[in-house]
Amino acid sequence: KHKLNKSPEEVLNAIKESVSYARKFTDDVEWSCEDGTRTDMDYMCKTVELAINSGAKTINIPDTVGYTVPSEFKKIIETLINKVPNIDKATLSTHCHNDLGLAVANSLAGVMAGARQIECTINGIGERAGNAALEEVVMAMRTRHDLMPYTTNINTKLLSKASKVVSNATGFPVQFNKAVV
């Protein structure tokens, strides 16, 4: 409603058509629930179930405008896990924007609730205030392995170097007191 300007039925038809079409070209289709964190939960559950039935293997829940706080994001992921009957056939993913400075916290809340993929960027680079910073996500998960017992294949010794490479390539300086790097 907020971003797509389509009726609920038009959105459902678009999901079925687009995911089915994408499956003609690849088995690994990721579907994103545009503006998901401001969507009615019952309707979101319906869209996620349809996307999975249409062939999506990853369900991405974006906080498109960086509006959500961690307790809300956690509840969204928990609700999807508890109410979408075929959720076990897909990987739940997060894609959080940093407009309120909560992208990393929301992403981690999603993981703690059951999401298994985080979409993030080096230095948090992204539109408007940016996205969840990869280096912060990785180090938080590594440091707080007691709460998030998951691993990545990221060589943490290279995070600072990667940060500098991205900064030099984009021309966006890294703030002097940036967390982690």
Model-derived features: where do they sit?
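Conserved thiamine diphosphate
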Residues: 19, 24, 139-151
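Glycine-rich phosphate-binding loop at the start of an alpha helix
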Residues: 45, 101-105, 131
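Hydrophobic alpha-helical scaffolding
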Residues: 8, 34-37, 66-70, 96-100, ...
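Alpha/beta enzyme core
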Residues: 1-92, 107-115
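A mid-to-C-terminal "edge-of-domain" accessory segment
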Residues: 145-181
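Small-aliphatic-rich amphipathic alpha-helix that forms the alpha element of a beta-alpha
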Residues: 98-121
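Beta-strand segments within the central parallel beta-sheet cores of soluble alpha/beta enzyme folds
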Residues: 61, 90-96, 120-123, 151-159, ...
